[in-house]
Amino acid sequence: ISHDRLEQRVAASEQSLRSSLLLLRNRARQLSEKGELLTPMAESILAVLAQYGSFNAAALYPVDSEGRLKGKPLAVMGEMSSLDSNDLLVQMCLEKGDVVSVRETIIEQGKDASLSSLQACVPLIDAEDRLLAVVAIKSMPFFAFNDRTFSLLALLGGHVADLLQSDPKALQLASLDAQHFSQHLKRARLDAENHDLPGSLMFVELSLENEPLLKALQDSQRGLDLQIQLRNGRSYAGVMILMPLTDAEGVLGYEKRLQYLLTERFGQGVSLDSLEVRVHHHQLDPKGRSTGLHDFLYIECGLNDQQMAI
């Protein structure tokens, strides 16, 4: 099941997936300056997962760097007895890095259900495949015991793990889109610094309001690129484009593609110049220095640190 389809299914519930994650993100913003987020957010995380999984007895356990349960639970709801670290479902969840249930254990694998005191386990695994915690579920109603619920819990677990690993500066940004963009920019900078991979930024600044042009820019987006619409300190609308794995030659190729699209949409002779558009470029520094990027974003493009964190 795709993430989009899952979000559509959840949208009919009292709180959509996005609004639930927004609540967690706001909590994370409040705590981000104080260090790690898992411990102080554990109860909130368990409550959100319980809302979608309908379970009434569960606990959230941290996982160490070796992939083992670490100490006591950080949050508990309902009647939960102490958990055996050798519990079958826990071990399967840690090994697979995915949601496991007692139904799957018994029916699909022929395991002995008496080897577990649980009904299901949900891992919190981020986009970098780091396992941060496990939610051990002891009791959930029969109506919730289905693939849809488990798929949704897996999706939520991944989103929550990404949030827990968020860069503190990015968490302070005003919008989810800005946070998402800044985290991808951080990753592109690390790729440049650690792996000598190219990366480019391009800011298209519109001197005049032009919705059809903004739509054309949106439609010009390539597969790996990321775009965000912003209004800078000069009160001009613009689009910041992150181009991972793209050098200066690749940027020229993108600009040719964009020019072709402009001709197609607006007619021969129309260019960014004729539309009174300024284009700003920046190549990510392979040595990881941020001075040039700082000047590009905050001086040349006229943005502020609430719109873009570095």
Residue ranges of predicted features:
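Regulatory sensory and allosteric helical modules in signal-transduction proteins
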Residues: 63, 70-72, 79-111
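Regulatory loop-to-helix N-cap segments in sensory/regulatory domains
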Residues: 110, 138-153
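Signal-transmission linkers at sensory-effector interfaces
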Residues: 2-33
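Short beta-strand-to-loop transition segments that serve as allosteric relay/switch motifs
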Residues: 134-143, 243-246
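Signal-transducing coiled-coil linker helices
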Residues: 29-45, 175-180
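A short, aliphatic-rich beta-strand micro-motif
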Residues: 117-126
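Conserved helix-loop-beta segment at the catalytic/binding core of cyclic-nucleotide signaling proteins
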Residues: 214-250, 260-269
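Active-site-proximal structural segments of metal-dependent nucleotidyl cyclase/transferase enzymes
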Residues: 184-206
